[in-house]
Swiss-Prot record:
PFTB repeats lie at residues 59-103, 106-148, 461-503, 539-579, 587-628, 645-686. Belongs to the terpene cyclase/mutase family. The gene is cas1. NCBIfam families: squalene_cyclas. Gene3D superfamilies: 1.50.10.20. It comes from the Eukaryota. InterPro entries: SQ_cyclase_C, SQ_cyclase_N, Squalene_cyclase, Terpene_synthase_CS, Terpenoid_cyclase/PrenylTrfase. The lineage of its organism: Eukaryota, Amoebozoa, Evosea, Eumycetozoa, Dictyostelia. Its EC number is 5.4.99.8. SUPFAM superfamilies: Terpenoid cyclases/Protein prenyltransferases (SSF48239). It comes from Dictyostelium discoideum (Social amoeba). The keyword Lipid metabolism applies. The keyword Repeat applies. It catalyses: (S)-2,3-epoxysqualene = cycloartenol. This is Cycloartenol synthase.
Amino acid sequence: MTTTNWSLKVDRGRQTWEYSQEKKEATDVDIHLLRLKEPGTHCPEGCDLNRAKTPQQAIKKAFQYFSKVQTEDGHWAGDYGGPMFLLPGLVITCYVTGYQLPESTQREIIRYLFNRQNPVDGGWGLHIEAHSDIFGTTLQYVSLRLLGVPADHPSVVKARTFLLQNGGATGIPSWGKFWLATLNAYDWNGLNPIPIEFWLLPYNLPIAPGRWWCHCRMVYLPMSYIYAKKTTGPLTDLVKDLRREIYCQEYEKINWSEQRNNISKLDMYYEHTSLLNVINGSLNAYEKVHSKWLRDKAIDYTFDHIRYEDEQTKYIDIGPVNKTVNMLCVWDREGKSPAFYKHADRLKDYLWLSFDGMKMQGYNGSQLWDTAFTIQAFMESGIANQFQDCMKLAGHYLDISQVPEDARDMKHYHRHYSKGAWPFSTVDHGWPISDCTAEGIKSALALRSLPFIEPISLDRIADGINVLLTLQNGDGGWASYENTRGPKWLEKFNPSEVFQNIMIDYSYVECSAACIQAMSAFRKHAPNHPRIKEINRSIARGVKFIKSIQRQDGSWLGSWGICFTYGTWFGIEGLVASGEPLTSPSIVKACKFLASKQRADGGWGESFKSNVTKEYVQHETSQVVNTGWALLSLMSAKYPDRECIERGIKFLIQRQYPNGDFPQESIIGVFNFNCMISYSNYKNIFPLWALSRYNQLYLKSKI
């Protein structure tokens, strides 16, 4: 019997890890997620440890295993960690506000930080596979010290050595400067302004915050509040020690105004434009003479928006950065109020435990997203009817995750329509997303063919289609959460230094192709729907957009996965679903591109450096997820070179573990081009999906 102190609890998608002083028998889900057994050796009921030799055997084993690690509310839980700059915000917020994390949680966070330390130079990077930099190293160092790790601990000494040898914490990027300032370990005069008065600008101005990408908007909203108030934690003995430890000169002798644009070369990815530097200079001058009346008005206005975001998301907030900064704002405004404790309770939603320790995820999970893909993979296997309980549960989660109504006062708070949409994670989170809605629609429609499932009504699915129709941009494409509201030149104001394309919500091939697929599937189920002509026009415009952004080599640049393999999978699937002829030059070129990247072992492997450089970079080894995407693309397009496809299928069968699981390989997700993020369920979903499609397309064998 395998035992554990930790177990995952779920409730309508909410995931929380609970600690017990006494070890308890581990569930299949716990064993899978925590790797309590050697990978490939855990054998849930109904599985065996005989290696698959045929595609049909591999499909059956993959389905059997993955169905056993489904949570009791129907979703598939997974690790959505990877970024290293998130957890320190939580640790600093708890320290500043005096909120005590449980000792068991603190131990696991410390274990994670040590496990993810670069063994060569002692630093940390922007994400778990990145080179060490000042942002990552400073914030993890500070976190370890705040959590009680002494300054003379060998790993801490090694990190401090790296930090000081590379210029110290004065070269940390702006988000790091912000967190250090709130801790009282950095002077507010060393930051470029985060002008809270911007929030009073009318929406008809192109630079108004309501026109920004929602993640950018919701991060800089509470940051501007904290900057305006100069909210700062107490100057404790530990903070005084940190002031001595992380800088290359005495804290009191640092010229803080000279540090505003001091960003280490190790960190710099997106440099400030000349225009931004001029504006920052003007804002620094304004900061000295700002109107108190106007600032107080802006503070009240922004806190109202912060409160709205908290309440609409049940204190989850759109993401982990504004989650912790919002919590800090509530503490500054109200102290340890009921709202503060609602915030504190929702910290658990972001903390994820895995084999390497406890991390902060890039969202409150990827529950709906992973479940929708899993449903589609299972449906294409041809054996979904053999796993009725699993499919019923998955359908249940899809059902309870659809957003039932629009957010209140949408226009005032810059929100888009929500009714009928699907979120990335949970209905409590509730932010509608174009491709999540599309995948939800596709999954709901696919499940209608199973007679033992209570289907989601076509009226409810049509609500989702309505959201997609409102989200289409003028260029024919779809962005992520909202329409593109601002001009592209707003990117000249990007102050982040480490991310690109943060200022507005751009049209993406992934979102556009997913929406085309969803609407194409819907019109087959509802050919006489009142909006069918609009749907047809929307699909045609979307196809034109996808073709317009295809690169000369036939690929599409992925913005949410790695990278050209991912983007090209969406590009091909979108065109094929729309009815584009398979002889279309766009499809032929795309297939040729993918085939040219196949490796000697039959697989595909793409490095995250493709996203960073925007040029295809081969990984050191083939990856099961990249291989799954490439094979799905080629088979969707009926690529004529069957040998190419069969070599990929053989690679997947060889890589499958005897129990039906697949190996966790390199990081596979990305956002804003420079930061990678984990999708641990992808290793199970996409190989199974590719194997299933191969069997349906070529073998047509019963399993």
